[in-house]
Regions:
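Substrate-binding clefts and catalytic carboxylate motifs of secreted carbohydrate-active enzymes
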Residues: 498-509
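Alpha-helical solenoid repeat scaffolds of the TPR/TPR-like class and their adjacent stem/linker regions
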Residues: 1-491, 502, 512, 541-548, ...
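Conserved hydrophobic helix-helix packing surfaces used for dimerization/oligomerization
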Residues: 324-328, 497, 526
């Protein structure tokens, strides 16, 4: 036995020095002589886990526990392996057993906190970290982990205190610097966040998460090229970094960097089709006209980031009320496209039948749109510092009947709120063009152009078919004066094609089409939005590669909204992007009397332009192939009489179209809400709903 004890100590030394195979050999030799030696079984279990054989590790540690069930270390290490395998419930039980055996076991409390945080039990996790710190007051990892839990609960000030405490205990704590940077980015301190990401990378040069986070903050301050470099470094360290392939490609598209785009697209396509965590769903919308692909990517995202959570239990059916209580949830109750499209709906709701409550994810902003939206609701609740769980609880406490997500998977939104079932009926509308691909969104509002009946299988939700998918106010802001070509930097003559979509929506394919159109229409120019300086330079280079003088592409500077709307009066034809069409921008153009030529595809976002044109009864502006789109643009530019006739038709139709009649569209939406609520009250499952035009 003595010899074996010495051998065991030698194995521990090898393990501490990283000589895992040597340590494994010694443990196996011990077990040949003493097959029931629990310490050797336990250590061998730990070693094979370190050598990437977790299944065998569990078997070995369990054997050790059978022999010596009152060893807290065995249970704690078993929990570590179980957690690594995703067996979080089992891991939690193992940590509880370790704590029951040794109530002062700080590491077990810390590890249990990690499992609780991973299962959306952040408050319980904080209690576990508090216990760990009670027994080891200078436990840096527990401070760091508690900071992460506070971050999950959006208690950012407490998180910052925890991360700084962890760093004061362990000054070379790279993970704590990275987490501190993440919180600083969240509270609007990108430059300070950048410093902390750089510090994390200095300490841990191969820290992939720090490179990824640094890329995010660089992108947020319009340093796209530096962001790309940081993303590429993260991917070099970890080629399968979750969802990074799409983010990297999306960032390149933001600056119109199309080098090797086709090869990158094909690689990304393959990853998504294999069910890998390859891309955020929104990053695919301007790259692929494929609703099936969009659904696959969204399923991977939602299962990873926002799985269904039943911790609040079923919603108790409340007594019938005189009014249906509608909750609208958004990060965009401000000067934003979503508010431009929705504020008139809020104001037009029938308050005898509906009560409206807003849940705003963003802090108050000092702009007219925020105040207008705020005034349109019966209650306007700022929930930016509440956790997803707390917002869902709040929604239930208020008795929300129908929860309407106005943002989906766009920036700053909170689909996690809906994962807890904030209301009996949950709806996606307006801000996000695609399926949420999960079981807890019941309905998606669209129209028959956007989602034909034969496309329903690409959507997890039941479809609400409105006569008009979107609407905007008749009484729009107007410029105080009429702008001239000269004021906008445009030549005094020549046909003006325009596209005021964000540059990220421009693909090499559609740009090549535009260049052929310019080549065919002598003296014509292309008037584009200017998203960023790098994009402008890259677009000019692309024009040269198509043998088009870059001076024929004029970039519009930022203008106040009223003056921006006036620029549509200068242009002759709006060329839509594909596969990601214009939405609010299309409505602005059409209301201003500017014809919009669109190319229709299969995906939600590639059919929005056609939706608006069909509602306006202008099918002659819808193209079904790139060749048709190109020839039609050239034809209209060379046929002034035909274009004048289309303008007259547009001007006549817009005044009687639901596209510009929010009161009418609100009635359609209210009819849909009533049908949804009737289904719920009758204990019927959601089903497709068609709202007839009156």
């Amino acid at each position: 036995m003595v010899a074996r004890s010495e051998d065991y100590k030698e194995a521990l030394k090898h393990q501490a020095s990283g000589r895992l195979a040597d340590a494994q050999k010694i443990c196996e030799d011990i077990l040949k002589v003493q097959p029931e030696n629990p310490d050797a079984l336990h250590l061998l279990g730990v070693l094979v886990f370190q050598l990437n054989n977790p299944e065998r590790s569990i078997d070995l540690i369990n054997r050790a526990i059978e022999i010596h069930p009152d060893n807290a270390d065995y249970h704690c290490d078993l929990g570590i392996v179980q957690a690594a395998l995703g067996q979080l419930g089992a891991a939690n039980i193992s940590y509880d057993k370790a704590i029951a055996i040794r109530p002062e076991f700080a590491q077990a409390y810390n590890n249990r906190g990690l499992v609780q945080a991973a299962t959306a039990q952040s408050e319980s996790a904080i209690e576990s970290y508090n216990k760990a710190l009670e027994f080891i007051p200078n436990f840096a990892a527990a401070y760091c982990n508690r900071g992460i839990a506070h971050t999950q609960l959006r208690k950012y000030e407490l998180a910052i205190v925890d991360f700084n405490k962890a760093i004061s205990i362990q000054p070379r704590y790279g993970e704590a610097y990275c987490n501190l940077g993440f919180v600083q980015e969240r509270i609007g301190q990108p430059n300070v966040a950048l410093e902390n990401y750089n510090k994390a990378i200095e300490i841990l040069p191969n820290y992939d998460v720090a490179y990824y986070n640094r890329g995010n903050v660089l992108k947020s301050i319009n340093k796209h090229s530096a962001a790309i470099n940081s993303y590429e470094k993260a991917m070099q360290i970890r080629p399968d970094f979750p969802f990074l392939s799409g983010t990297l490609l999306h960032t390149k598209m933001e600056i119109c960097d199309w080098e090797d785009l086709e090869a990158h697209q094909n690689a990304l396509l393959s990853q998504v089709e294999q069910g890998k965590k390859a891309s955020r769903p929104l990053d695919l919308h301007n790259l692929f006209d494929s609703p099936s692909l969009h659904k696959l990517a969204t399923e991977a995202w939602m299962q990873s980031k926002h799985p269904r959570n039943t911790s609040l239990g079923e919603i108790t059916k409340k007594p019938i009320c005189n009014k249906i209580r509608i909750g609208y949830y958004s990060a965009d109750f401000r000067e934003h496209a979503v508010s431009h499209l929705s504020v008139d709906i809020f104001e037009s709701h029938n308050r005898n039948k509906f009560e409206l409550i807003a849940f705003s994810y963003r802090p108050e902003v000092n702009d007219g749109m925020y105040k207008r939206v705020q005034g349109a609701f019966d209650q306007f609740i700022e929930v930016r510092n509440q956790s997803d769980l707390d917002i869902a609880k709040h929604s239930r406490d208020l008795g929300i009947d129908i929860a309407v997500d106005l943002g989906g998977l766009t920036s700053g939104q909170r689909p996690g709120v809906f994962s807890y079932r904030a209301a009996p009926t949950q709806v996606s509308y307006l801000g996000y063009g695609g399926t949420m691909a999960c079981e807890y969104y019941d309905y998606l509002m669209a129209d028959e152009t956007i989602i034909p009946r034969e496309h329903q299988n690409y959507y997890s939700e039941k479809i609400v078919y409105l006569p008009s998918y979107q609407t905007s106010a008749l009484h729009r802001a107007r410029a105080q004066k009429k702008l001239t070509r000269q004021e906008l930097g445009l030549p005094e003559s020549g046909f003006i094609f325009c596209c005021f979509n964000n540059n990220i929506k421009i693909t090499p394919s559609i740009f090549s089409t535009w260049m052929r159109i310019l080549e065919a229409v002598e003296g014509s120019i292309l008037f584009l939005n200017a998203s960023n300086a790098v994009a402008i330079e890259n677009i000019k280079k692309e024009a040269l590669s198509h043998r088009i003088n870059p001076d024929r592409i004029i970039f519009k500077k930022f203008l106040p909204r009223a003056e921006h709307l006036a620029t549509y009066g200068i242009a002759d034809l709006f060329l839509d992007t594909f596969p990601y069409n214009a939405a609010t921008t299309a409505n602005d153009a059409l209301w201003s009397g500017l014809p919009l030529l669109t190319l229709v595809g299969k995906s939600f976002v590639s059919r929005v332009g056609a939706s608006a044109l069909n509602v306006l009864q202008l099918p002659e502006l819808i193209s079904y192939s790139q060749a048709e789109y190109e020839s039609r643009a050239i034809e209209l530019a060379k046929s002034p009489a035909q274009l004048v006739a289309i303008r007259k038709k547009l001007q006549a139709n817009r005044t009687r179209s639901p596209l510009f009649d929010p009161k009418h569209v609100t009635k359609y939406i209210e009819s849909a809400y009533i049908k949804m609520h009737e289904h719920y009250r009758s204990a019927l499952p959601p089903e497709h709903i068609w709202i007839a035009e009156d």
